[in-house]
From Swiss-Prot:
Organism per entry: Pasteurella multocida (strain Pm70)
Protein name: tRNA-dihydrouridine synthase B
Disulfide bonds: none
Active site: C100
A Pfam family it matches: Dus
């Protein structure tokens, strides 16, 4: 699959997720097979561009793979300016957020709130596409609510404005993340558009990924919450989708080493206080797929020193690995 001049290595992408898809997490997902990863959402409000959070999100030069950056806002001129600034900092693809359902985003008329105003959508897309030389993509939902599913209308506007690829999450804004994603509307859009369509929503296994691609005939899929604590999912999906073969997840020992590396990179990227704080949620997600332990998690969450976090994790993982070895010996 191509987006603009970029040939992507596969059709399995990491979704932009605020507070999650920072550089360390994107690097790990790229290593484990994500064909394209997107940054956290960047506000187009110039008043926040100089905050520490925005500065970290603007550091595109250390990226692994293609630098795809998502921006969010509602003012066409501000959106265009934000796109230009991100390109100056190294962004190679600009993605426009018109899918976020969060109230704090929608109250500012950004994210999925824009789906209610097709004329404004057209103004924004035209401005951004004309302001940069890199490909511009768009992420939306199927509509504002069940009575206003207008993703086909928005998709046609996007294609007319020069959008290079369109991601559709299979829920309306009013659904938030409740219920199950539906793929009929994604399929309908794909049937009528010529630009690449990326399907998104509730894709948490290789089998589901293959089903969604086959059902919708989408050009690619985008994985969001399914990747939390599970970055190796991309490799498993790629093997089934691209090679029609099953590849095993990494060994427990490899997973433990990856987690330790991830936590160490978070400390280096964010600094002591914030790095330790962000590490806690990632550790919680990782442990869900390895060995949930509320007692250890509570103790880990109380640690405020980076070295002590790593020591605690190493000790916990050593116990898990020792138990596994004992179980193997007793069964053989």
């Amino acid at each position: 699959m191509r987006i603009g001049s970029y040939q992507l290595k596969n059709r399995i992408f990491l979704a932009p997720m605020a507070g999650i898809t920072d550089q360390p997490f994107r690097r790990i997902c790229t290593h484990y097979g994500a064909g394209l990863t997107f940054s956290e959402m960047m506000s187009t409000n110039p008043q926040v561009w100089h905050t520490e959070k925005s500065k970290l999100r603007l550091a595109h030069h250390q990226e692994a793979g293609i630098n795809a950056v998502q921006i969010a806002g509602c003012d066409p001129d501000e959106m265009a300016k934000a796109a230009q600034i991100n390109v100056e900092y190294g962004a190679e693809i600009i993605d426009i957020n018109m899918g976020c359902p969060a109230k704090k985003v929608n109250r500012k008329m950004a994210g999925s709130a824009l789906l209610q105003y097709p004329d404004l959508v057209k103004q924004i897309l035209n401005k951004v596409v004309k302001s940069v030389t890199v490909p511009v993509t768009l992420k939306i939902r199927t509509g504002w609510d069940k009575d206003n599913r207008n993703c086909l209308e928005i998709a046609k506007i996007a294609e007319q404005c020069g959008i290079q690829a369109l991601t559709i999450h299979g829920r309306t804004r009013s659904c938030m993340f409740e219920g199950e994603a539906e793929y009929d509307n994604i399929k309908a859009v794909k049937e009528q558009l010529s630009i690449p369509i990326i399907a998104n929503g509730d894709i948490t296994s290789a089998e589901k990924a293959k089903y969604v691609l086959d059902y919708t005939n989408a050009d690619a899929i985008m994985i969001g919450r399914g990747s939390l604590g599970n970055p190796w999912l991309f490799r498993v999906m790629e093997s089934l989708i691209e090679k029609d073969s099953i590849v095993l997840e990494p060994s427990l020992n490899e997973k433990c080493n990856v987690i330790l590396q991830h936590i160490q990179e978070l400390h280096q990227f964010y600094g002591v206080e914030k790095g330790c704080r962000i590490a806690r949620k990632h550790v919680a997600w990782y442990l869900q797929g390895i060995q949930p332990n509320p007692v250890f998690r509570q103790a880990f969450n109380a640690i405020t020193d980076p070295k002590e976090q790593l020591i605690a994790l190493e000790g916990f993982f050593n116990l898990i690995l020792m138990d596994k070895e004992k179980n193997v010996r007793t069964t053989t």
